[in-house]
Amino acid sequence: HIHDRRQRQMCIRDSESMRHFFPTYQGNNEKTTLAPKLENILDDFEALLLDAFGVLNTGASLIPGIVKTLNIAREKNITLLVVTNGASNNSYKKREQLSSLGLEFSDEEIISSREAAEIFLSYNQPEGPLGVMGNIGDDLNIPNLNCIELEQDYSMFEEMNSFILLGTLQWDTVWQEILFNSLKENPRPLFVANPDLVAPHEEKFSIEPAYYVSHLVKNGIHLPFWLGKPFPTIFELAMNRINELSGRYIPLSKIGMVGDTLHTDILGANSFGLKSILMTKHGLLKNTNVGKMIKHTNIIPDYIVESP
C-alpha cells in the first residue's frame, strides 16, 4: 500500500494548500467520540447527511454494512440525506446508481453540488452566456440563462461571459490550457460545482475539479466561486431539505455529517455548526495514520468511526 498511502498523503497536502480559501471554524474543546461503527452512535442524531464515495460506496461496490445501518437508522426515525460533491450528472442518476448497488433513496433524499449550483445560479445569475464544462447529464436547469456546452465547440470560449466547471471526466491538459489562457486574457467569473480534489474508486483515485482549479489559481487566475462541500450553499440547501423531509425543525446539534474526507465533509460540517462524523476505513483515509492527519490539519471531527 506504499504507493497508495503516498497518494492519499499527497491529496491531504494538496487540500492543505487550498485551506486559505476554504471556510474557517473555531475548533471546539469537546473531545472526539470514538466508536467502531456508525451504528453505535445513531442515538445521538435525528438526521444524518451522508457523503457518497467512501461512506455509501467506493466505485461500483457498496461499503459492507451500510444497508443494515441505514435500515436501523430509518427504524429509529432518523432522517437521511445524501449530500454529494458530484456535478457532472443529475442527482437522479446518483439515486439510480445507488439503487443498482442495492441502496434505496427517494429523489428528495439526494442533494448534489450540481443542484446547489443550479439553485445558486438561478438566484444569483451571472452574465450570460455561461460556458458549461464537464456536463454528461441533462442540460443545466437555470431559467433564463443561456448555457453553452463548450465541449461541443471550444472556439466559443472567448464569447462566454462566465464559466462553470461541473466535472473532469473528459478534462485534460489541452482543456486546462484553453481555460487558463482564456481567463488570463479576459478574467470572467468561474463557478466550480465540485470542490473535491479526488474521489476514491476500488483501486484508484479519479482527479476531480478542485485539483485542476487549484493549479489555475496557483498560476495567477482569480479565485472561483465554489459550490459544494465544504462551502455553505450546499449545507443551507441540505438544512431546508432535512426540515422538509422530517416535517419538523431539527437543531444543528442533532444533525451529523458522515464523510471520509477532512477538508470537505468534516471541515464543512464543523464550519456550518453540524456534528461531524469521520469514517476512516473505506475512503480517502484508508490505510493512513488518521490521528496524524487530524493533528496535521487541525480539522477535528466530533466523532470517528471505522465503518457503517
What are these regions (language model features)?
Residues 13-49, 57:
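Positively charged, low-complexity intrinsically disordered leader regions
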Residues 40-63, 82-83, 269, 274:
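Asp-based phosphoryl-transfer active-site loop
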Residues 68, 76-153:
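Active-site phosphate-binding/coordination module
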Residues 1-12:
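Single conserved hydrophobic/aromatic residue that forms the stacking wall/gate
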Residues 226-265:
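Conserved Lys-Pro-Asp/Glu-containing loop-to-beta segment of HAD-superfamily phosphomonoesterases
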Residues 293-308:
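C-terminal cap/substrate-recognition subdomain and adjoining C-terminal extension
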Residues 147, 258-292:
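Acidic, Mg2+-coordinating phosphoryl-transfer loop and its flanking beta/alpha structural elements
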Residues 118-205:
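HAD-like small-molecule phosphatases
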